[in-house]
Amino acid sequence: MSDNYNIQNYINGSFSVSANTEEIKNINPSDSSIINSFKETSIEDVESAIDVAKKSQSKWSKTPAIERASYLKKIAEGIRKNEDEFVRIIVEEQGKIKDLAKGEVQGAANYLDYTAEWARRIEGEIVTSDSPDENIFIFKIPMGVVSGILPWNFPFFLIVRKLAPALVTGNTIVIKASEETSNNAYMFSKLLDEAGVPKGVVNFVYGRGQTVGKLLSSSKKIDMISFTGSVETGSAIMTEAAKNITKVNLELGGKAPALVLADADIDLAVSKIRDARVINSGQVCNCVERVYIDKKIADEFTEKLTKAMQNTKFGNPNTKTDIDYGPLINEDGSKKVSELVNSAKSSGAEILTGGNRDDSSEGIYYHPTVIANCKQDMRIIQEEIFGPVLPLVEFEDLDQAIEYANDSDYGLTSSIFTNNLK
């Protein structure tokens, strides 16, 4: 077990070890080894983080927006200087291939710079009143204290996605990283310290959703909750937030459909759909989760897609670069993928390639999978898979395809492949 990470809370500009005795193990999904363990933030420490964020917010909101933005640029500069280290950490604890992790780190720095520019665009309004000798002034003011609750699939970028808009608009924030990917968040908190961000403006706590996340969702002192993750967790957060009528901003799961019409460039569709399914081992909420194919081209498309998935390489991203994807995040994720694939098979679907976990390595890997003869009411079509699995459904015409695509409890994205947008 590595001692490289000694995760500590970052509260009021200081690092401190939690008094909690509950420890969480951080597992490398590529080989199932223990990277490190850390103490879950105690109830008292979470409450302290919220309190200092509350106390710091008034002064921070009065700081000129352009000055607030300058801290975002300093953080972005720090990210770029430490890019290689952040990439290494993300690959190690989350299982991304190196190129994807590098893109995430670079995207985070770019997003900070982009958000900093909004300091010049925080504007109010003067509205002419219906009453004489009166004008209406509209001011944009900060929400107050934001809690940012992060997912594990893009753990680094989502830090800045929560932090940057909050800070530039005069809010303070308490961030909880996923317990699966806390090391990159801890290293990020060190950047904040080096950038000189005022004490109490940004605070980091660590732990499970059922404990630390619940506190950040139920506190009366939190003015807004920003969460990215599963529908189930989002629903639980809404339940807690409703008790105080706290504003929530939720980005939840997805079941993105891809429609392949008869006039589509089949090779292009195969390439894009394959890439969109295996990116981050299929653990991306807005990438293809189900494919609808016109019956007239179904045989050709299915054959080419199956070959493309058979040629897809996976492996340990810590040691290999010639791979398309790495491991699933944990055993629970692997079990969910297996359960949905097995359910489809038992309901009459046909596994054309893959359909099982790779047992030849110690990591958590799942073979690239294509499943034909799926029906619209199957669980694998209706539920989020979050793995390198492509279920296929054939359709008669565009109206039926659109009906199928819209028959979902999820939102987010969709795609269509055609050479005739009319």
Where are these regions (language model features)?
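Conserved C-terminal structural/oligomerization subdomain of aldehyde/semialdehyde dehydrogenase
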Residues: D31-S37, I222, R357-D358, Y365-K422
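Short, well-ordered beta-strand elements within core beta-sheets of diverse protein domains
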Residues: I35-T41, S56-K62, S147-G148, A258-L261, ...
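Structural signal for hydrophobic packing residues in well-ordered secondary-structure cores
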Residues: Q57, S61, A76-E83, V87, ...
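ALDH superfamily catalytic-core signature
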Residues: M224, E232-K375, L398-D399
